[in-house]
Swiss-Prot record:
Source species of the chain: Styela plicata (Wrinkled sea squirt)
UniProt key word Hydrolase: yes
Protein name, per record: Tyrosine-protein phosphatase 19
Domain Tyrosine-protein phosphatase, chain residue ranges per copy: 1-115
Catalytic activity: O-phospho-L-tyrosyl-[protein] + H2O = L-tyrosyl-[protein] + phosphate
Enzyme class: hydrolase
Binding, substrate: D83
Keywords: Hydrolase, Protein phosphatase
Protein origin, superkingdom: Eukaryota
C-alpha cells in the first residue's frame, strides 16, 4: 500500500483468486466489504464491491497517516481464470479490460496502473 500511496496509483488489476483448488494463491491485501483494515501506516476501507460476470470491482478509500492524504483506488479482480488452464472464453476478460481502461481514463491520473 505504501507503493500505491507513493506513486498515487488509482487502479489495480488482479487476475487470480486468493484460493484455487483449496490452495492459497495470493495474499489478500484488502479489507472485507464495508470494513477498514490497517496495513502498517495505511488504512484501507473497502467502500464498495460490485460483482460483474466474471470479475469484481472494488472501490477502496486509502488513508495514509504519514502522507496525510486520502485517495480512491479501484481494484478489478478477474475471478473466472481456472487453475492451470485458460478460460473457455475471453468475453468476460475483454469486458473487464474495457471497464479497467474506462476507469483508468476517468481518474485523470498519469500514475501507473498496478497489475
Amino acid at each position: 500500500w505504501l507503493m500505491i500511496v507513493e506513486q498515487k496509483c488509482r487502479v489495480i488489476v488482479m487476475l487470480a483468486k486468493c484460493f484455487e483448488a483449496g490452495k492459497k494463491k495470493c495474499q489478500k491485501y484488502w479489507s472485507d466489504s464495508k470494513e477498514t483494515k490497517k496495513f502498517g501506516r495505511v488504512k484501507v476501507f473497502n467502500a464498495e464491491e460490485v460483482k460483474y460476470c466474471g470479475f469484481l470491482r472494488r472501490k477502496f478509500l486509502i488513508e495514509s497517516v504519514d502522507e496525510g492524504i486520502t485517495m480512491k483506488v479501484f481494484q478489478y479482480q478477474y475471478i473466472n481464470w481456472p487453475d492451470h488452464c485458460v478460460p473457455n472464453t475471453t468475453s468476460n476478460l475483454v469486458r473487464m479490460h474495457k471497464y479497467v481502461i474506462q476507469c483508468f481514463e476517468e481518474t485523470g491520473s498519469d500514475a501507473p496502473m498496478v497489475v
